[in-house]
Design a protein with these regions (language model features):
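Conserved glycine-rich cofactor-binding loop
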Residues: 17-18
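Substrate-binding pocket helix/loop in short-chain dehydrogenase/reductase
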Residues: 101-102, 106-114, 196
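Active-site loop-to-helix junction immediately N-terminal to the catalytic Tyr of the SDR YXXXK motif
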Residues: 105, 151-160, 171, 195
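Active-site helix of classical SDR
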Residues: 125, 161, 169
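Alpha-helical segment proximal to the catalytic Tyr-Lys
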Residues: 130, 174-178
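Residue(s) in the substrate-gating loop at a strand-loop-helix junction
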Residues: 145
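Conserved small/polar residues in nucleotide/adenosyl-binding loops
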Residues: 199-205
Length: 209
């Protein structure tokens, strides 16, 4: 396997119990990284973390956390620091594939999506950037989608929220580059995962096909 030069790097991944988050955590642990995972379902998260521990024989920290809650975000970072002493990489991966036409998206849908995908990233970046600034190194990776740059019809509120995340990424990248901190977004395409599978299973019903 190719070497990503990640041995003993501490990587915090939100939305780490399923899909791309879990797959990334497993690969990074295989590369020797010390991984901290968070998810809302504590027992399920622990099961998935145990899979990674057993397969990689590496230290994996699982922390139950709802990233839409500011206090829980603070606790997530504090527990990671307490266990691993630092954070080298933050992966803001939490999110859903919410997609509907404009007339079907309620105020609550907008608020929930922005809180989950954008404000969670804002809060966690705010918490980890001082740590990275102090040691003059670090990396933040924000999950996004191509629809954040070129949205399709019926892609709300996700496309708007991800567009904001892409803008946040570029803003932070410009601001914190002098501190040797890299901030990047990955525009993810269709990947076979639980959220995508659910979307495709329910799409015919949504479209009344």
């Amino acid at each position: 396997m190719f070497d990503l030069n990640l041995k003993d790097k501490v990587i915090l991944i939100t939305g780490g119990s399923d899909g791309l988050g879990f797959a990334s955590a497993k690969l990074l642990s295989e590369q020797g990284a010390k991984v901290a995972l968070c998810g809302r379902r504590g027992d399920y998260l622990k099961e998935k973390a145990n899979i990674i521990r057993e397969e990689t024989k590496n230290d994996v920290l699982d922390i139950q956390c709802d990233v839409t809650d500011a206090d829980q975000c603070k606790n997530l970072v504090e527990q990671t620091i307490s266990h691993f002493k630092t954070i080298d990489v933050l992966v803001n991966n939490a999110g859903t594939s919410a997609a509907a036409g404009f007339e079907n998206v309620t105020d609550q849908n907008w608020e929930d999506d922005i809180n989950l995908k954008l404000m969670a990233a804002v809060r966690l970046c705010r918490l980890v950037l001082p740590i990275m600034k102090e040691k003059k190194s670090g990396s933040i990776i924000n999950a996004a989608i191509g629809g954040g740059k070129a949205p399709n019809a019926g892609s709300l509120p996700t496309s708007v929220t991800r567009a904001a995340g892409i803008n946040l990424t570029k803003s932070l990248s410009n601001e914190f580059a002098p501190f040797n901190i890299r901030v990047n977004a990955i525009c993810i395409g269709l990947i076979k995962s639980a959220p995508v599978s659910y979307t495709h299973l329910t799409l015919p019903t949504t479209l009344s096909v």
